[in-house]
Amino acid sequence: MRCFRTKGYDEVSVNDICGEADIARSTFYRAFSNKKDVIRYRFEHTDANQIVSIEELLAARNDFDRMWVIGDRYISLCCELGPTFCAAMMNLTLAGEIDMLQVAHSVDAWFVRLTRNCQQTGIIRSHEPPELLGPLFVDLEYQTLYEWCRSQGEYPVRAQARRRAEMLANLAPEYRWSKEQLENADKM
């Protein structure tokens, strides 16, 4: 994955992947047909249950922040891979070759439960059904990542994702991030 991050998806060849992994091309071709298969494998083996530690979830101060911890983990993965690579994954999704959204929506059941809890405690003031609202948080984050890719990484992806999620939820003011937190969100 490192060579995708440094060179970008389009510029990486199978030779580059083999050189980075220190394997023969024949070894590569026993597992994969092409570089798209590497991306497909990476996304098919990304699971929400593996992406966030229980410690991170327990440390969050409320259920909305737990949703943020989960969502931010996906943002972090995309930021680690870079906007060019992330954009290539989005293009492969549009072409029907991988399904980034399926992986992202693997957290929907969690988001529905956490949204319901937040509505019951008054953290989320939106009265939309949790079954509709929970998955919308994922869609909104995906759209925010799209903007980040489009700007070649020159877009405050974390601050915008957090602010948009707060607005979608009609989050109670005491749970919203401060201006300072938003300004520092992308310096992580």
How should each PLM-predicted stretch be described?
Residues 171-188:
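C-terminal effector-binding regulatory domain of bacterial HTH transcription factors
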Residues 48-51, 96-123, 131-139, 146, ...:
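Amphipathic alpha-helical packing segments from all-alpha helical-bundle domains
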Residues 3-37, 41:
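Helix-turn-helix
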Residues 1, 17, 42-46, 50, ...:
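Generic hydrophobic, amphipathic alpha-helix propensity
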Residues 6-10, 81, 121:
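Short coil/turn segments at alpha/beta junctions that flank glycine-rich nucleotide-binding fingerprints
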Residues 41, 52-81, 130-137:
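Hydrophobic alpha-helical connector segments
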Residues 75-98, 146-150:
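Amphipathic alpha-helical segments used for helix-helix packing
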Residues 84-89, 123-127, 157, 179-181:
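Short, hydrophobic secondary-structure boundary micro-motifs
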